[in-house]
Amino acid sequence: MSDVSGGESSSHKRNVDSAANENDDMQNKRQKTEELGGHDDQLNDIFNDPLPGFGGSESNSTPYNDNAQEGELGPENFDATLPKEGDPLDIDFDNLPTNFLEAEQATNANNGSQVDTPSGPGSVPNMSVTTNSASMSASPNNTPRPTPLSKTNSRSETPVGNSSRATYDGTNLKQEFGINGLSNKQEALNRYSQMPPTNRMNHLAPQPQGIQGLNTSSIDRIPSTSTSNKEQLHTNDPSKLNDALAAAGVDIQHEEELLMQQHLNRSSRFPSAQQPPRQRFAQTSLFSPYHVAAFMQRVARENGVMQNFYQDAELLELMSTSCENWLSNIITKTIILSRHRRRGIPTITNTKQNKKTASSSASMSNPASRSELSKELRNLAAKQKEMEERRVSKRMALGLEKDGTDPGNGDPANGKAGAEETLHRAANATAAMMTMNPGRKKYSWMTANAGSGGGDDSKVASEKDGKSKQSSIIAARGDNGLRFREIRSGNSVTMKDLLGALEDERMGTEKAVLKGYAKLKD
């Protein structure tokens, strides 16, 4: 009996102690709530369901009965205190209980939006506030309610691609709205009752989504203890947003400058169609810059100079211009030597006879079409012809040679020879006429040789000569008169002219002159 009575007394003592502890807890809670200026029933309105910390466990907790005494619970107004689904939350931050904040500090909150099941009296569910309404913690009647996280991290940074946002710490909430008081209550209520501004700079980034009656935009303004101010991710300042191009190392301003420079270079390289052709020709160099640079680099390497000439455009242009001037000088000298070769140096005299002969020769022939050399050769041939006629005349006077046109000549052998010669000339004239131009008009002098003999030949020769009458003896020998003769290469520049111009150069022409004389045929 003593054991039974002892057990009953111990159990009764434990019940009394637990009841005393519960009464002490209730008195402490009411005292702290009165310090904040609120009542216990306002805490039920905040979270839309009864809290196990005020009524024991969550299953048997009931709201306060207004008709009963303070601290007693009644089931009359249990359903009336629960808000309907969809009603906005009315949070009074001035009258928050401190026991809720102290209990949360001792609880290890999970990262995310899950609700911890209360394990006993006085336990507080752990929830996290996020911007996505689908990931918020909910009460048994599917009504969202915010729950602060742990004390350690007052703000957690998330990447741009993640849909979750930074969470708010209950410690900061206590410091801002707790015992120390609030300097500007209306400003805090406005911050937590408006939607956060959207990110207009990056449309791909997830836009913040607030819950009913709660705004988390000011959470980003709270400085983080783990990161410095320079490394913070500013989501509300468009000028400080981390752009994807800047994160990749792309400088937009530098790229624009390069693009503008390329456009200017392209416009200077390819002039417009409205530009005059002379200016465009002046800008074009004689040689290709690539070939000039390759040649200069090869010669410089042979002399021990290592330099890249491809990048120096001004040097290449200067070298091309100098080569053009040097070639122009060589070609000018070559043309001068060609003229001197074809035309002799005229004699400069002040005599009237020379002036008359010069004027008469200029009127008879075009000096531009016939060279002085051809004229001198023709004069020499005319003098030789006159000498030959005088010699033949002397032989005929001495009887050493007979005239072929004499009609009294009755030698049959001579007559037969004359007939054969006449037929031969006629055949040659016919063949020449057929081969050269068979369809042209026939003149009398073309067929006069076949019937008349050497007398007509002298007439034709005299017409061609124009100066002196040709002898019949010379005409019988087949001489049709003198003509002007021009050299085939007389009006062009030859290898001799070019070699003469290169020999005048002092440096850099030795090898070229040797190769030229080796290729010279005549």
UniProtKB/Swiss-Prot annotation:
GO CC terms: transcription factor TFIID complex
Homology family: Belongs to the TAF4 family.
Spans annotated as Disordered: 1-172, 194-237, 346-375, 398-420, 448-479
CDD domains for this protein: HFD_TAF4
Protein name: Transcription initiation factor TFIID subunit 4
Domain Histone-fold as annotated: residue spans: 293-379
Keyword Secreted: no
Polar residues composition-biased segments: 57-68, 105-117, 125-172, 209-237
Annotated GO MF terms: DNA binding; RNA polymerase II general transcription initiation factor activity
Biased composition (Low complexity): 358-371
Subunit architecture: The 1.2 MDa TFIID complex is composed of TATA binding protein (TBP) and the 14 TBP-associated factors.
Sorted UniProt keywords: Coiled coil, Nucleus, Transcription, Transcription regulation
Species: Debaryomyces hansenii (strain ATCC 36239 / CBS 767 / BCRC 21394 / JCM 1990 / NBRC 0083 / IGC 2968) (Yeast)
